[in-house]
Amino acid sequence: MDWPVSVALAQSVPELPTGTDWNYEMKLDGHRMIMWRTDDGVRLQARSGRDVTAAWGDLALAGHHLPAGTVLDGEAVITTEDGRISFEAAQARAASSPTRAHRLATQCPAHYIAFDALQLPSGDVRPRPYSERRAALLSLLAGLPATTPIQAVSATTDRDTALTWYNTLHNKHGVEGIVAKRATSSYRAGRTGAWQKIRHAETVDADVIGYTGPLTRPRALAVRLPNGRTSLTQTLSAPLAAQIAQVLVAAGPAEKGSTDTSEAYTKIPSGLATVEVLAGTTRHAVVTPLRLR
């Protein structure tokens, strides 16, 4: 398997599928991450393919307990003192310099919630059905130290249990949704019907086509939405602005552009970055950005 690997994605659906061929997993509000345990050490990959090892050194260290040749798919999460998953804390960590990330890891350690095995020391397991990959993942993680921050995502074959999680764990614990996965499905990159999700806040991905403000501290982004409309986002949070600034250094010479409503911005090449935005805001004059993909 070659770095970076393309990840499987879930389709948004209005309700969870029914039937005996489905498994249901908690969807946690963190940062999607592929954990690579190689002969040389551990590398951590973002969904976009970026190397994010430096920001998550505590998880990279924990990954050394995995056998070489292991590749896992999962979510990096950080919890607050009251036990709630904090996307803001994960965002701050992801945007930090290595020095600050190390300090934040000491204050608020991260957990890696694994939900799939892509490769084991025996080889690529993506063609195998989900039920077999899940069993292999649980067996693998059972051999890690008791104090490891690497854990398997909670899952059930009972739809009613999954709906109870969805309805009761959002406000208290930060569970943002449920992902249903067909037990017989292989791991396929992209968005397929084999993975389906419901979540409390629906989102879409938007192509970043520019920014406003200084290159080193962008104030807002210009994005192209799935319907083709171009728009500015709301003001970026400090962590998201810092993350975007790291990407913009590769943007090249600056040119001016304007949105469909004639709002000026500085252009960047299409395809350089993608952000997740709240779906409910895509009809508004400005959209709400959540995270860098």
What does each of the following model-derived ranges do?
Residues M1-R293:
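Catalytic cores of nucleic-acid ligases and guanylyltransferases
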